[in-house]
């Protein structure tokens, strides 16, 4: 051991020497053949811990700080600690803390401000005593200020006690001192790697390099850009991105070491202790310029000096106050910048010459500083081992984190047989949000040091793998312990406000734990976890949403699926029956799960759909609740102003309506909602008509009205007649049920006539003779024609007709692209829509965007124009102002494509589509419609192709002589199921007027087959309006096959009968 500095009280342990000041490193004979584990330096005393766990002290003992009454000039053993294996020590001005290998803390010395944590009344304690209030807590680090103390537990809890004159306890301004350890609750949840204390200021360092400081700040030693004391922990923002891995404090200054080996200092600089070649104080962290060319691996602070070790040269550098020789430079001069400590230093990596004697050179193992003294543990070049590197943490001094080594240790014990200490270790780890927040860090490329509001610093793949490795069926005791710790300790302690982004990580990682997905844990773990998440304050929730938004889609989906499963589980319980006494808690559970999904859905929409929107659909909803009743309840809640935007506690008294969370509804459920809404509006319109009719009996000025919207049309003038009636129709009448009457026909409209009307009028309106729509051969789709001579009223009528069809639950045959439905739902068409409508043009645009070279102008020769046909002639339209003079290049090609798409779908047809849009929404507008996705709305208007032919057979009804087991019916279905897909689709077209099925599926498509007279020579006949098939009584399978195929092959148009 080398030592230098103030020896006036014997604090260097050199024995009875004459000098009171040792100006340069001197060997201590006492430590020959002894290995030192740790050194603590007080103002006038020093404590040494040897590798065998014994403790020796020397120096001033006026206040009992040595823990013994022996010689003060040379190290003497503290016999009271003989039975303990001490692993670390720390010294205040005149008090000492010692930590044993069991995590217990012993204290002695001055106790004027309660800095020993013993809750005693004595001024000083001369023999070490155990701090009993910490005896049940496993402490891994201790740190002493002059009159206060800090401790870090294995569970990432920070305790403080002693003087609080300057706020150095971090407990607020109210208390002056604490005589027993107090938990700093404001830091709960943060994963810490170090605690440090200065004269009257304190620091904690997180695993990802964030620093929190509090206490005295007269000289800027907290680095917070001012000189105001802090009574609660404050984040040192300026160092967050610097990868700080170690921090140490002097009386009024602070030094921080980075992962790259840089050093920052701040605070008091009056003696040059900051190393910036000045005596100025620094209120912000500043890098020590003269050390920037070297990689520093160790730093230490004395009262008013600083030391740094550079392993590449093997040298120790020091700066600051030198009046007591503490710089080791051979003089008492102060140094304002790093200066080499005198000595024959030898680098561990250096080549050892044969002629170097072991007595002549020193290979540094570790440096220590405190008070006005400094020490260096060294070895000879011949026996030199690698020096300590403060950039690498000692696992024994760190908090619990879930890692491969720990899991391997836990799994190494046979199931049900691991010792109590292992159970305590598992319990401690999973009872602490700080420990979980320090687990699964993204260590590759030191990514976790970038933790912030946009990046979590977590390796989610590691979290998934380690959780699945830990939770295994053949180790049920571990799973039970983890579940119990989460349920009873971790989750109940969660709060809505969090001290830092690092305290949020477990909200990201815990859903990866298989226990969360176990339905047995839904009400005890998953839902309480969700409640804590939902109750987060706005700022931390926003950060969590940011983190979710950059997750890999499968990881994001995992969280969504978890809470969908919770919702389904709860709805199943509800269907079975919930006792009235449990209804309130059930409501809160269901609200919680749905609220979490709502937040996730918001994130998904904000990010442009991280996962497909339909991944939020809960398809079981239709089976588990009465959607119609749920919608009615929701409408009533809206009418009475019930607000479901507040916290879960308040929601417990509000019945859950799934309609409040419409993103969980699939297309079928939304269609049911729309139909329910339509029925309600129809009923309201009918009721209003009835009230008006009753009033007209007593008040002749009030005209009677029809409760239905009646359309009387002639087949030969169906468009003109319909337009005439609809032009005169009031908006409120569109909400009435539609009844259609064909002039000269007696049929009562029970739905079939209405269906026929829609089929006929849409066929007529889309006829090329009107020139309203342009037909695209490549895609077989139509779009609004900007060359039409028709009045916009006709487009308005088509919009009304489409709206009426939906409102009256009828499929219509429209060959529009998906872009139409996007625009109806206020979504922007994209290049994909252009590819659908105009495949060749769309492909060309994609080729333009994908072209890798820079010579786009020369290769494509394009400008911001579009060439269109105008009655046989071509016309050039500018897409932007001065488009003809604006060439398309690599920089603006995306703008060109966007402008092209905008012209086709928006600008060129704006007035026509606006008329269509107004007509459509006049009938069918409202909140429910906006719940649909474009492809869902398309499927509802024109049907879809999700065929289930067995379901069609199952739901078919029979009339006359037929029943399901009739021989003709049996061979009919045999023939039908043997038909190829295209023939089956032709059959649908033949029978229903469309080869597509309603969005509600085959179960909603009711076919009727009835027997007819005549022989087997007759063909089957379809009554399209009623989905009715007249089927002769065929007896031979082949005959039936031929006749059926003949009938559907010769079907033209809609085959209406």
UniProtKB/Swiss-Prot annotation:
Gene3D superfamilies: Hect, E3 ligase catalytic domain, Hect, E3 ligase catalytic domains, Regulator of chromosome condensation 1/beta-lactamase-inhibitor protein II. One of its GO terms (molecular function) is ubiquitin protein ligase activity. Keywords: Cytoplasm, Differentiation, Repeat, Spermatogenesis, Transferase, Ubl conjugation pathway. It is found in: Cytoplasm, Cytosol. SUPFAM superfamilies: Hect, E3 ligase catalytic domain, RCC1/BLIP-II. Pathway: Protein modification; protein ubiquitination. InterPro entries: HECT_dom, Hect_E3_ubiquitin_ligase, RCC1/BLIP-II, Reg_chr_condens, Ub-ligase/GTPase-reg. It comes from the Eukaryota. It holds the Pfam family HECT. The keyword Manganese does not apply. RCC1 repeats lie at residues 1-51, 52-101, 102-154, 156-207, 208-259, 261-311, 313-366. Residues 730-1057 form the HECT domain. The keyword Repeat applies. Probable E3 ubiquitin-protein ligase involved in either protein trafficking or in the distribution of cellular structures. Required for spermatozoon maturation and fertility, and for the removal of the cytoplasmic droplet of the spermatozoon. E3 ubiquitin-protein ligases accept ubiquitin from an E2 ubiquitin-conjugating enzyme in the form of a thioester and then directly transfer it to targeted substrates. This is Probable E3 ubiquitin-protein ligase HERC4. It comes from Rattus norvegicus (Rat). The lineage of its organism: Eukaryota, Metazoa, Chordata, Craniata, Vertebrata.
């Amino acid at each position: 051991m080398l030592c230098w500095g103030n020896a006036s009280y014997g604090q260097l342990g050199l024995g009875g020497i004459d000098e009171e000041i040792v100006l340069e490193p001197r060997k201590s004979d006492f430590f020959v053949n002894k290995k030192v584990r740790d050194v603590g330096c007080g103002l006038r005393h020093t404590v040494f811990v040897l590798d065998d766990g014994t403790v020796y002290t020397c120096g001033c003992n006026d206040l009992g700080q040595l823990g013994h009454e022996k010689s003060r000039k040379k190290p003497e053993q503290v016999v009271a600690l003989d039975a303990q294996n001490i692993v670390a020590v720390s010294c205040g001005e005149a008090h000492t803390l010692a930590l044993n290998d069991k995590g217990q803390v012993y204290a002695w010395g001055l106790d004027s401000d309660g800095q020993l944590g013993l809750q005693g009344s004595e001024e000083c304690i001369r023999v070490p005593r155990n701090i009993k209030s910490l005896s049940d807590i496993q402490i891994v680090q201790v740190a002493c200020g002059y009159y206060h103390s800090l401790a870090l537990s294995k569970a990432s809890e920070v305790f403080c006690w002693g003087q609080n004159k300057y706020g150095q306890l971090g407990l607020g301004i109210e208390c002056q001192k604490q005589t027993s350890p107090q938990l700093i609750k404001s830091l709960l949840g943060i994963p810490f790697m170090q605690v440090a204390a200065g004269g009257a200021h304190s620091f904690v360092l997180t695993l990802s390099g964030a620093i929190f400081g509090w206490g005295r700040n007269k000289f800027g030693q907290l680095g917070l850009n001012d000189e105001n004391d802090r009574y609660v922990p404050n984040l040192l923002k300026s160092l967050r991105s610097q990868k700080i891995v170690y921090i140490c404090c002097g009386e009024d200054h602070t030094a921080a070491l980075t992962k790259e080996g840089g050093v920052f200092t701040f605070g008091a600089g009056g003696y040059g202790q900051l190393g910036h070649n000045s005596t100025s104080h620094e209120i912000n962290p500043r890098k020590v310029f003269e050390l920037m060319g070297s990689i520093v691996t160790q730093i230490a602070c004395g009262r008013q000096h600083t030391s740094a070790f550079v392993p590449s040269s093997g040298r120790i550098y020091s700066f600051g106050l030198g009046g007591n020789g503490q710089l080791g430079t051979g003089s008492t001069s102060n140094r304002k910048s790093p200066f080499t400590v005198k000595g024959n230093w030898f680098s561990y990596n250096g080549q050892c010459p044969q002629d170097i004697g072991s007595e002549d050179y020193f290979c540094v193992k570790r440096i220590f500083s405190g008070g006005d003294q400094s020490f260096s543990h060294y070895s000879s070049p011949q026996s030199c081992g690698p020096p300590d590197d403060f950039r690498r943490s000692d696992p024994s001094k760190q908090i619990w984190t879930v890692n491969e080594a720990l899991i391997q240790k836990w799994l190494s014990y046979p199931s049900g047989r691991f010792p109590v200490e292992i159970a305590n270790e598992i319990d401690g780890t999973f009872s602490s949000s700080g420990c979980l927040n320090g687990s699964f860090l993204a260590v590759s490329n030191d990514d976790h040091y970038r933790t912030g509001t946009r990046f979590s610093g977590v390796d989610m793949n590691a979290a998934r793998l380690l959780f699945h490795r830990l939770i295994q069926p053949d180790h049920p005791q571990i799973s039970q312990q983890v579940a119990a710790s989460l349920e009873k300790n971790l989750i109940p302690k969660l709060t809505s406000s969090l001290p830092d982004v690092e305290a949020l990580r477990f909200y990201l990682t815990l859903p990866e734990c298989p226990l969360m997905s176990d339905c047995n844990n839904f009400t005890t773990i998953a839902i309480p976890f969700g409640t804590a998440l939902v109750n987060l304050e706005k700022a931390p929730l926003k950060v969590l949403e940011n983190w979710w938004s950059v997750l890999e889609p499968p990881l994001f989906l995992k969280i969504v699926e978890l809470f969908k499963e919770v919702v389904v589980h709860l709805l199943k319980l509800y269907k079975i029956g919930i006792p009235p006494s449990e209804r309130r808690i059930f409501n809160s559970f269901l609200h919680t799960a749905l609220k979490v999904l709502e937040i996730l859905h918001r994130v998904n929409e904000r990010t442009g759909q991280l996962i497909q929107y339909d991944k939020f659909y809960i398809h079981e909803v239709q089976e588990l609740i009465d959607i119609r009743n749920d919608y009615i309840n929701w409408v009533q809640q809206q009418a009475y102003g019930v607000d479901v935007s507040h916290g879960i506690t308040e929601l417990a008294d509000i019945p859950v309506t799934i309609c409040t969370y419409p993103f969980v509804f699939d297309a079928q459920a939304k269609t049911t909602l729309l139909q329910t809404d339509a029925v309600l509006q129809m009923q309201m319109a009918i009721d209003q008509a009835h009230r008006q009719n009753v009033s007209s009996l007593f008040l002749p000025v009030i005209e009677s009205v029809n409760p239905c919207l009646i359309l009387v049309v002639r087949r030969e003038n169906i468009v003109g007649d319909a337009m005439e009636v609809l032009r005169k129709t009031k908006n409120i009448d569109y909400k009435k049920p539609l009844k259609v009457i064909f002039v000269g026909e007696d049929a009562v409209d029970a739905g079939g006539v209405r269906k026929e009307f829609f089929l006929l009028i849409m066929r007529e309106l889309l006829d090329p003779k009107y020139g309203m729509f342009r037909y695209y051969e490549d895609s077989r789709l139509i779009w609004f024609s900007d060359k039409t001579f028709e009045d916009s009223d006709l487009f308005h009528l088509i919009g009304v007709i489409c709206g009426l069809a939906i409102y009256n639950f009828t499929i219509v045959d429209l060959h529009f692209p998906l872009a139409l439905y996007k625009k109806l739902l206020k979504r922007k068409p994209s290049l994909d829509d252009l590819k659908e409508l105009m495949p060749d043009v769309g492909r060309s645009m994609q080729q333009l965007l994908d072209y890798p070279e820079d010579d786009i102008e020369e290769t494509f020769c394009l400008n911001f124009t579009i060439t269109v046909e105008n009655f046989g002639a071509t016309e050039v339209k500018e897409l932007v102002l001065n488009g003809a003079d604006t060439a398309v290049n690599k920089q603006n090609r995306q703008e060109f494509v966007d402008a092209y798409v905008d012209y086709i779908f928006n600008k060129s047809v704006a007035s026509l589509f606006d008329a269509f849009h107004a007509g459509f929404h006049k009938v069918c507008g409202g909140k429910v419609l906006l719940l649909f996705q474009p492809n869902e709305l398309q499927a509802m208007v024109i049907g879809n192709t999700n065929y289930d032919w067995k379901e069609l057979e199952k739901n078919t009804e029979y009339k006359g002589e037929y029943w399901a087991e009739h021989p003709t019916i049996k061979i009919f279905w045999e023939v039908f199921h043997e038909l190829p897909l295209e023939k089956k689709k032709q059959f649908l077209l033949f029978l229903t007027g469309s080869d597509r099925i309603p969005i509600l599926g085959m179960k909603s498509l009711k076919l009727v087959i009835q027997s007819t007279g005549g022989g087997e020579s007759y063909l089957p006949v379809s009554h399209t309006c009623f989905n009715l098939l007249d089927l002769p009584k065929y007896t031979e399978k082949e005959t039936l096959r031929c006749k059926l195929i003949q009938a559907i092959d010769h079907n033209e148009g809609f085959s209406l009968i």
